[in-house]
Amino acid sequence: MELKIQNITKRYRDKTAVDDVSITLTPGVWGLLGANGAGKTTLMRMLAGILRPSSGRILCDGVEIGTLGAAYREKLGYLPQEFGFYPEFTVQDYLEYMAALKGLPRTEAARQIDTLLERVSLTEVRRKKIIKLSGGMKRRVGIAQALLNDPEILILDEPTAGLDPGERVRFRNLLSEFAQERIVLISTHIVSDVEYIAAENAVMKAGKIIAQDTTEGLVKQIEAKVWQGNIPMEQLSRWEYRLRVVNLRNEPDGTVTLRYLADAPQLPDSVPAQPRLEDLYLWLFPEEMEEAK
Protein backbone atom coordinates (compact mmCIF):
# COMPACT_ATOMS: atom_id res chain seq x y z
CA MET A 1 0.00 0.00 0.00
CA GLU A 2 1.38 3.40 -1.02
CA LEU A 3 -0.25 6.83 -1.19
CA LYS A 4 1.83 9.19 -3.30
CA ILE A 5 1.19 12.93 -3.34
CA GLN A 6 2.85 14.60 -6.31
CA ASN A 7 3.20 18.40 -6.45
CA ILE A 8 -0.26 19.04 -5.00
CA THR A 9 -1.44 22.66 -4.95
CA LYS A 10 -4.81 24.06 -3.88
CA ARG A 11 -5.71 27.68 -4.61
CA TYR A 12 -8.75 29.70 -3.53
CA ARG A 13 -8.86 32.83 -5.70
CA ASP A 14 -5.95 34.89 -4.37
CA LYS A 15 -4.94 32.45 -1.60
CA THR A 16 -2.80 29.32 -1.91
CA ALA A 17 -3.78 26.92 0.89
CA VAL A 18 -1.49 24.05 -0.16
CA ASP A 19 1.60 24.87 -2.19
CA ASP A 20 3.38 22.22 -4.31
CA VAL A 21 3.37 19.46 -1.67
CA SER A 22 4.97 16.10 -2.45
CA ILE A 23 5.17 13.19 -0.02
CA THR A 24 4.85 9.41 -0.20
CA LEU A 25 2.94 7.69 2.60
CA THR A 26 3.58 4.02 3.37
CA PRO A 27 2.09 1.78 6.10
CA GLY A 28 2.51 3.07 9.64
CA VAL A 29 1.49 6.13 11.63
CA TRP A 30 2.37 9.49 10.09
CA GLY A 31 2.13 12.79 11.93
CA LEU A 32 1.17 15.97 10.08
CA LEU A 33 2.18 18.87 12.31
CA GLY A 34 1.52 22.55 11.87
CA ALA A 35 -0.16 25.59 13.36
CA ASN A 36 -3.78 26.44 12.60
CA GLY A 37 -3.98 27.73 9.03
CA ALA A 38 -0.88 25.83 7.87
CA GLY A 39 -2.87 23.92 5.22
CA LYS A 40 -3.21 20.58 7.02
CA THR A 41 -7.00 20.33 6.76
CA THR A 42 -7.03 21.31 3.08
CA LEU A 43 -4.41 18.66 2.31
CA MET A 44 -6.36 16.01 4.21
CA ARG A 45 -9.60 16.92 2.45
CA MET A 46 -7.84 16.39 -0.87
CA LEU A 47 -6.49 13.03 0.31
CA ALA A 48 -10.02 12.07 1.35
CA GLY A 49 -11.31 12.94 -2.13
CA ILE A 50 -13.54 15.77 -0.85
CA LEU A 51 -11.57 18.55 -2.56
CA ARG A 52 -9.96 18.45 -5.98
CA PRO A 53 -6.42 19.81 -6.25
CA SER A 54 -5.81 22.86 -8.42
CA SER A 55 -2.79 20.99 -9.76
CA GLY A 56 -0.79 17.85 -8.99
CA ARG A 57 -1.80 14.22 -8.49
CA ILE A 58 -2.67 11.81 -5.68
CA LEU A 59 -1.91 8.18 -6.50
CA CYS A 60 -2.97 5.08 -4.56
CA ASP A 61 -0.70 2.19 -5.54
CA GLY A 62 0.12 4.00 -8.77
CA VAL A 63 -3.45 4.90 -9.81
CA GLU A 64 -5.00 8.37 -9.43
CA ILE A 65 -7.66 8.38 -6.71
CA GLY A 66 -10.14 10.09 -9.06
CA THR A 67 -9.82 7.14 -11.43
CA LEU A 68 -10.28 4.63 -8.60
CA GLY A 69 -13.45 6.38 -7.41
CA ALA A 70 -15.52 4.09 -5.16
CA ALA A 71 -12.69 1.55 -4.97
CA TYR A 72 -10.55 4.20 -3.25
CA ARG A 73 -13.35 5.29 -0.90
CA GLU A 74 -13.76 1.67 0.22
CA LYS A 75 -10.14 1.70 1.40
CA LEU A 76 -10.57 4.99 3.24
CA GLY A 77 -11.52 6.01 6.77
CA TYR A 78 -11.80 9.75 7.43
CA LEU A 79 -12.45 11.83 10.54
CA PRO A 80 -12.80 15.56 9.79
CA GLN A 81 -12.24 18.26 12.39
CA GLU A 82 -16.00 18.70 12.63
CA PHE A 83 -18.41 15.94 11.65
CA GLY A 84 -22.16 16.28 11.28
CA PHE A 85 -24.97 14.09 12.59
CA TYR A 86 -28.75 14.23 12.82
CA PRO A 87 -29.76 15.61 16.25
CA GLU A 88 -32.13 12.70 16.91
CA PHE A 89 -29.49 10.04 16.20
CA THR A 90 -28.27 7.89 19.04
CA VAL A 91 -24.69 6.62 18.92
CA GLN A 92 -26.02 3.27 17.67
CA ASP A 93 -28.22 4.95 15.02
CA TYR A 94 -25.33 7.02 13.72
CA LEU A 95 -22.89 4.13 13.44
CA GLU A 96 -25.51 1.93 11.74
CA TYR A 97 -26.23 4.76 9.31
CA MET A 98 -22.54 5.28 8.53
CA ALA A 99 -21.99 1.53 8.15
CA ALA A 100 -24.81 1.43 5.58
CA LEU A 101 -23.26 4.34 3.67
CA LYS A 102 -19.96 2.47 3.63
CA GLY A 103 -21.72 -0.60 2.22
CA LEU A 104 -21.21 -2.95 5.18
CA PRO A 105 -23.58 -5.94 5.40
CA ARG A 106 -25.82 -5.74 8.49
CA THR A 107 -24.27 -8.66 10.35
CA GLU A 108 -20.75 -7.38 9.74
CA ALA A 109 -21.81 -3.86 10.72
CA ALA A 110 -23.36 -5.09 13.98
CA ARG A 111 -20.22 -7.01 14.89
CA GLN A 112 -17.93 -4.11 14.00
CA ILE A 113 -20.04 -1.58 15.92
CA ASP A 114 -19.97 -3.75 19.06
CA THR A 115 -16.19 -4.13 18.82
CA LEU A 116 -15.49 -0.45 18.19
CA LEU A 117 -17.83 0.83 20.90
CA GLU A 118 -15.93 -1.30 23.37
CA ARG A 119 -12.57 -0.09 22.04
CA VAL A 120 -13.53 3.57 22.40
CA SER A 121 -15.33 3.01 25.73
CA LEU A 122 -18.81 4.03 24.54
CA THR A 123 -20.77 0.79 24.96
CA GLU A 124 -22.76 2.18 27.90
CA VAL A 125 -23.96 5.24 25.94
CA ARG A 126 -24.80 3.52 22.65
CA ARG A 127 -28.52 4.33 23.09
CA LYS A 128 -27.88 7.93 24.08
CA LYS A 129 -28.42 10.79 21.62
CA ILE A 130 -25.14 12.13 20.27
CA ILE A 131 -26.25 15.72 20.84
CA LYS A 132 -26.26 15.04 24.61
CA LEU A 133 -22.71 13.65 24.71
CA SER A 134 -19.66 15.57 25.89
CA GLY A 135 -17.21 16.90 23.32
CA GLY A 136 -14.75 14.10 24.06
CA MET A 137 -17.42 11.42 23.67
CA LYS A 138 -18.55 12.91 20.33
CA ARG A 139 -14.94 12.76 19.16
CA ARG A 140 -14.78 9.08 20.11
CA VAL A 141 -17.96 8.43 18.11
CA GLY A 142 -16.22 10.06 15.15
CA ILE A 143 -13.17 7.85 15.61
CA ALA A 144 -15.40 4.75 15.70
CA GLN A 145 -17.14 5.72 12.43
CA ALA A 146 -13.78 6.25 10.72
CA LEU A 147 -12.78 2.67 11.63
CA LEU A 148 -16.08 1.00 10.67
CA ASN A 149 -14.96 -0.33 7.29
CA ASP A 150 -11.57 -1.52 8.59
CA PRO A 151 -9.85 0.95 6.22
CA GLU A 152 -6.42 0.52 4.67
CA ILE A 153 -5.94 4.30 4.74
CA LEU A 154 -7.04 6.26 7.82
CA ILE A 155 -7.04 10.07 7.74
CA LEU A 156 -7.67 11.81 11.06
CA ASP A 157 -7.89 15.60 11.38
CA GLU A 158 -7.23 16.74 14.96
CA PRO A 159 -8.61 13.45 16.33
CA THR A 160 -7.80 14.04 20.00
CA ALA A 161 -9.47 17.45 20.33
CA GLY A 162 -11.61 17.33 23.46
CA LEU A 163 -10.22 14.03 24.76
CA ASP A 164 -8.91 13.85 28.32
CA PRO A 165 -5.34 12.55 28.93
CA GLY A 166 -6.46 8.97 29.62
CA GLU A 167 -8.58 8.89 26.46
CA ARG A 168 -5.65 10.24 24.44
CA VAL A 169 -3.39 7.45 25.67
CA ARG A 170 -5.99 4.79 24.81
CA PHE A 171 -6.49 6.37 21.40
CA ARG A 172 -2.75 6.38 20.65
CA ASN A 173 -2.50 2.73 21.64
CA LEU A 174 -5.48 1.88 19.43
CA LEU A 175 -3.87 3.62 16.46
CA SER A 176 -0.51 1.91 16.97
CA GLU A 177 -2.29 -1.43 16.97
CA PHE A 178 -4.41 -0.52 13.95
CA ALA A 179 -1.50 0.78 11.86
CA GLN A 180 -0.10 -2.68 11.11
CA GLU A 181 0.09 -2.77 7.29
CA ARG A 182 -2.14 0.32 7.06
CA ILE A 183 -1.49 4.00 6.41
CA VAL A 184 -2.59 6.25 9.28
CA LEU A 185 -2.20 10.03 8.88
CA ILE A 186 -2.87 12.21 11.92
CA SER A 187 -3.08 15.98 11.63
CA THR A 188 -2.46 17.76 14.92
CA HIS A 189 -0.82 20.69 16.65
CA ILE A 190 -0.60 18.64 19.87
CA VAL A 191 2.88 17.20 19.42
CA SER A 192 2.56 14.53 22.12
CA ASP A 193 -0.19 12.87 20.07
CA VAL A 194 2.36 11.66 17.52
CA GLU A 195 5.76 11.92 19.20
CA TYR A 196 5.90 8.30 20.35
CA ILE A 197 3.73 6.51 17.77
CA ALA A 198 4.52 8.14 14.41
CA ALA A 199 7.01 6.39 12.14
CA GLU A 200 7.55 9.72 10.39
CA ASN A 201 6.34 13.29 10.74
CA ALA A 202 5.84 16.04 8.20
CA VAL A 203 5.68 19.68 9.29
CA MET A 204 3.53 22.15 7.32
CA LYS A 205 3.85 25.91 7.35
CA ALA A 206 2.14 28.38 5.00
CA GLY A 207 0.93 25.55 2.77
CA LYS A 208 4.33 23.91 2.31
CA ILE A 209 6.00 20.91 3.92
CA ILE A 210 9.08 22.44 5.50
CA ALA A 211 10.42 19.33 7.24
CA GLN A 212 9.92 15.58 7.01
CA ASP A 213 11.73 12.84 8.92
CA THR A 214 11.43 10.35 11.75
CA THR A 215 10.88 11.82 15.20
CA GLU A 216 14.55 11.15 15.98
CA GLY A 217 15.66 12.80 12.75
CA LEU A 218 13.55 15.89 13.35
CA VAL A 219 14.70 16.21 16.95
CA LYS A 220 18.35 16.20 15.79
CA GLN A 221 17.64 19.46 13.97
CA ILE A 222 17.10 21.20 17.30
CA GLU A 223 20.19 19.85 19.07
CA ALA A 224 22.31 22.61 20.68
CA LYS A 225 19.31 24.95 20.61
CA VAL A 226 17.55 23.75 23.79
CA TRP A 227 18.89 25.02 27.11
CA GLN A 228 18.10 24.91 30.80
CA GLY A 229 19.03 27.55 33.32
CA ASN A 230 18.13 28.71 36.81
CA ILE A 231 17.21 32.27 37.86
CA PRO A 232 15.88 34.04 40.97
CA MET A 233 12.10 34.34 41.00
CA GLU A 234 12.25 38.16 40.91
CA GLN A 235 13.97 38.01 37.50
CA LEU A 236 11.33 35.78 35.91
CA SER A 237 9.24 38.41 34.12
CA ARG A 238 12.33 40.00 32.57
CA TRP A 239 13.73 36.75 31.22
CA GLU A 240 10.35 35.35 30.21
CA TYR A 241 9.92 38.16 27.69
CA ARG A 242 13.50 38.08 26.45
CA LEU A 243 13.69 34.31 25.91
CA ARG A 244 11.66 31.72 24.01
CA VAL A 245 10.68 29.83 27.16
CA VAL A 246 9.26 26.35 26.54
CA ASN A 247 8.42 25.71 30.19
CA LEU A 248 9.42 26.69 33.70
CA ARG A 249 9.57 24.95 37.07
CA ASN A 250 9.43 26.53 40.51
CA GLU A 251 12.15 25.16 42.78
CA PRO A 252 11.93 24.66 46.58
CA ASP A 253 14.66 27.28 47.15
CA GLY A 254 12.56 30.03 45.53
CA THR A 255 14.36 30.02 42.19
CA VAL A 256 12.92 29.11 38.80
CA THR A 257 14.35 26.66 36.26
CA LEU A 258 13.68 27.70 32.66
CA ARG A 259 13.80 25.49 29.59
CA TYR A 260 14.30 27.76 26.59
CA LEU A 261 15.23 27.83 22.91
CA ALA A 262 18.21 29.80 21.60
CA ASP A 263 21.17 29.46 19.24
CA ALA A 264 23.48 29.93 22.23
CA PRO A 265 23.06 29.92 26.03
CA GLN A 266 21.50 33.14 27.35
CA LEU A 267 21.32 32.55 31.11
CA PRO A 268 24.35 32.23 33.39
CA ASP A 269 25.32 28.60 34.01
CA SER A 270 22.90 27.29 31.35
CA VAL A 271 23.37 23.68 30.28
CA PRO A 272 22.16 21.88 27.13
CA ALA A 273 18.81 20.09 27.55
CA GLN A 274 17.69 16.90 25.81
CA PRO A 275 15.62 18.09 22.81
CA ARG A 276 12.08 16.86 22.15
CA LEU A 277 9.76 17.06 19.17
CA GLU A 278 7.80 19.81 20.91
CA ASP A 279 10.98 21.91 21.00
CA LEU A 280 11.37 21.62 17.23
CA TYR A 281 7.72 22.54 16.73
CA LEU A 282 8.05 25.67 18.85
CA TRP A 283 11.34 26.55 17.13
CA LEU A 284 9.61 26.40 13.74
CA PHE A 285 6.46 28.19 14.99
CA PRO A 286 7.74 30.96 17.32
CA GLU A 287 4.50 32.89 16.76
CA GLU A 288 2.68 30.36 18.96
CA MET A 289 5.02 31.18 21.83
CA GLU A 290 4.52 34.91 21.27
CA GLU A 291 0.73 34.51 21.40
CA ALA A 292 1.05 32.78 24.77
CA LYS A 293 2.96 35.69 26.31
Summary of predicted features, one role per range:
Residues E96, A100, T107-V125:
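Conserved ABC ATPase "signature" region
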